[in-house]
Amino acid sequence: QDLTGPAITPPEWCFGPWMSSNRWECADQVEEQLAQMEQHQIPATVLVLERWSDDTIFDRFEDASHHVEPGSHCFCDEELDFTHNRRWPSPRRLCQKIQEHGLKLILWQAPILRLPPDGQYPQAEQDIAYAIKNHYCVMMPSGQPFRCAEGWFKGSLLLDFTNPKAVAWWQAKHA
């Protein structure tokens, strides 16, 4: 409790039915689910999007075009181009539709910095270098960053959520 503080009761909407699927991988599929929910009068308070980004691009909708920026940079809507993005052509409009249905939106994400395939994700490489340089990830006693072992997200970094600066950086990247 010293680390996290006392437990706080979550808002009421947290206790309602949640809609979620790892198979909704585009705005059209999500909009179809909203229509089905309305047509069949399925009660829900939350819609969870799991496939909104891939696991390497952790802070923006997948397929958004942008310039590569230093790892300290936090992208805003105006910097992201969805012109050629057929899967998520307008995340802002989709979020508004979800809200119009009276739902809260949760973007599911593993809180990791995934090791990208060499050269395929230059922005992820910038973000990882910045996190390591600033000790925003869990570090080994040797001073090297801890990397996930075999299995899920092999080679990925874990963000150090006990570091207030790491938390602020992570939150700013998602704002």
State each model region's role.
Residues 8-175:
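Aromatic-lined carbohydrate-binding/catalytic grooves of carbohydrate-active enzymes
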